[in-house]
A protein has these predicted regions:
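Short helix-capping/hinge SLiMs at alpha-helix to coil transitions
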Residues: 17-20
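Key DNA-contact positions within bacterial/archaeal DNA-binding proteins
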Residues: 37
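Short, hydrophobic-biased segments on the C-terminal half of alpha helices
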Residues: 43-44
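A short, conserved structural fragment
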Residues: 47-57
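Pre-recognition alpha-helix immediately N-terminal to the DNA-recognition helix
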Residues: 11-15
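Short, cationic-aromatic polyanion-contact patches
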Residues: 2-10, 24, 56-78
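Alpha-helical residues within the helix-turn-helix
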Residues: 27-30, 47-48
Length: 90
């Protein structure tokens, strides 16, 4: 049987950042169960699509969520990131 999930790693990373905006990429990856390298790639994807903004906080990065960005075709044009985060309890 093929392994699948309801929420992609992109959604899980977005949720992890929402709950822990000052965490390192390594810590975020550990929360989700993926490598630090994969986490960096997903963070870049989320930043490129406008879901998050990354800023420096000392030697670390801090992340801000842009909850009004549409989720795209999967959830319909009107669904926003804030609805997904709300469903996940964040």
């Amino acid at each position: 049987m093929r392994k699948w999930s309801f929420v992609t790693n992109h959604g899980l990373i977005l949720a992890a950042i929402a709950g822990n905006p000052d965490s390192t990429a390594r810590a975020i990856g550990d929360m989700v169960g993926i490598t630090e390298r994969a986490t960096h790639k997903i963070i870049t994807d989320l930043e490129d699509e406008g879901y998050i903004t990354k800023s420096k906080s000392g030697r670390r990065n801090a992340y801000s969520i842009h909850a009004d960005v549409p989720l795209g075709e999967t959830f319909g044009e009107k669904a926003r990131a804030k609805e997904l985060l709300s469903m996940l309890g964040l």
